[in-house]
Amino acid sequence: MAVKIRLRRMGAKKAPFYRIIVADSRAPRDGKFIDEIGYYNPLTEPVEVKINEEKANEWLSNGAQPTEVVKRLFNNAGLTK
């Protein structure tokens, strides 16, 4: 099972809010997930990002692959693989 760290869209129409989740790569974007490790709100100024670093590092060490957007969020937050 390939595990990805990716964004799950929440919020209203034209007002997106994202949760950073760990999910099977074959699961739909807003479908079943394994764990929630944070959130990302692109509409606030400055952009609001909260990541549980302990959980994120645990999943990265277990082999979960972050998507490109999540990699960028991790780098901005100071988390590196």
Curated annotation (Swiss-Prot):
Cellular-component GO terms for this entry: cytoplasm; small ribosomal subunit
Gene3D superfamilies attached to this UniProt entry: 3.30.1320.10
A Pfam family the protein falls into: Ribosomal_S16
Alphabetical list of SUPFAM superfamilies matching this protein: Ribosomal protein S16
InterPro entries per the UniProt record, alphabetical: Ribosomal_bS16, Ribosomal_bS16_dom_sf
Keyword Mitochondrion recorded: no
Gene Ontology molecular functions: structural constituent of ribosome
Coiled coil regions in record: none
Any single GO BP term: translation
Keyword field: Ribonucleoprotein, Ribosomal protein
Protein family (similarity comment): Belongs to the bacterial ribosomal protein bS16 family.
Protein name: Small ribosomal subunit protein bS16
Organism: Clostridium beijerinckii (strain ATCC 51743 / NCIMB 8052) (Clostridium acetobutylicum)
